[in-house]
Amino acid sequence: MTEYFEVGKILSPHGLKGEVKVNATTDFPEERLANGSRLFIKNSDQYQELIVDGARRHKQFYLVKFEEIDGIDQAEKVCGKELYVAETDQQELPEGSYYFKDILNCPVYDAETGEKLGVLANIETPGANDIWEIKPEHGKSFWIPNIESVVNKVDLANKRIEVTLLEGLRDEN
């Protein structure tokens, strides 16, 4: 069974010819929204394919034309729907890069002591660097920045993340 991953959301129609305004939530908007790209929306429990017929940046959004949508009435019907990419359409990432789905729930260890700190429970992308929520088995969750001085190693093969905690990142109380 094919898995699908969210890459954006259709916000509103734009004009009368079926263009829609899209908030892209992917690190690869130019690739995902390239002419001929396959994206999907979910209707009930089925995924419907949409083929990108054109896209351009507009402020912090993208204006996208899909082959299957040729008027404002059809565009209004897809507003509010998330856009997905099929797992089979995902590109191979460069060395040292990974999809969130591959590292979520990985155990996180202190690189110096080997102590298990918890699991990677959540990832937020607020700005220049992602921040990761580490959820210990007992106690309060804490957040770390995904920067070289903190995240030392991400071993996808062994599902293991090693970090060096800077002073103040973890509330010991």
Swiss-Prot record:
Gene Ontology CC terms: cytoplasm; ribosome
GO molecular function, one term: ribosome binding
Subunit: Binds ribosomal protein uS19.
PRC barrel domain residues: 95-169
Keywords for the protein's UniProt record, in alphabetical order: Chaperone, Cytoplasm, Ribosome biogenesis, rRNA processing
Protein name in the entry: Ribosome maturation factor RimM
Pfam families (UniProt xref): PRC_RimM, RimM
InterPro entries xref list: PRC_barrel-like_sf (IPR011033), PRC_RimM (IPR056792), RimM (IPR011961), RimM_N (IPR002676), RimM_N_sf (IPR036976), Transl_B-barrel_sf (IPR009000)
Organism placement in taxonomy: Bacteria, Bacillati, Bacillota, Bacilli, Lactobacillales
Principal location class: cytoplasm
Gene3D superfamilies, sorted: PRC-barrel domain, RimM
Gene name linked to the record: rimM
Family, per entry: Belongs to the RimM family.
